[in-house]
Design a protein with these regions (language model features):
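ABC transporter nucleotide-binding domains
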Residues: 1-126
Length: 126
């Protein structure tokens, strides 16, 4: 039986506010962030970020909001470029389609794009 971790959650964070989300293991913190960053669909209810609906406006939210998980989900045997292309495909897009959004970062990884992800340092993986 699935548990509803985020039941009856109501949260509003104002512009410029500093906010921290804390709680015990399994409380739903990661699930909440994945929903708010459009990486996971909620089973029910609604969520918005910057006044944008996380389902209807997911492309605009992804343009504005970044999410860096504590663990990295790179495929160690693929190159940096292969990983980027794979994850772009997962999100039904391409690097070329979003190049204006990733140009600065992409130029920084250019020297490493043919390196296997397993050979990157932790900082480079981020």
């Amino acid at each position: 039986m699935a548990m509803s971790r985020l039941r009856d959650l109501s949260l509003e964070i104002g512009s410029g506010e500093l906010f921290g989300l804390i709680g015990p293991d399994g409380a739903g913190k990661t699930t909440l962030f994945r929903i708010l960053t459009t990486l996971l669909l909620a089973d029910s209810g609604t969520a918005s970020v910057c006044g944008l609906d996380v389902v209807k406006d997911l492309k605009e939210i992804r343009r504005r909001v970044g999410y860096m998980p504590g663990r990295f989900s790179l495929y160690q045997d693929l190159t940096v470029e292969e990983n980027l292309n794979f994850f772009a495909t997962v999100f039904n897009t391409t690097i070329e389609e979003n190049y204006d959004l990733v140009r600065d970062i992409y130029s920084q990884i250019e020297p490493f794009k043919h390196r296997r992800a397993g050979k990157l340092s932790g900082g480079m993986k981020q």
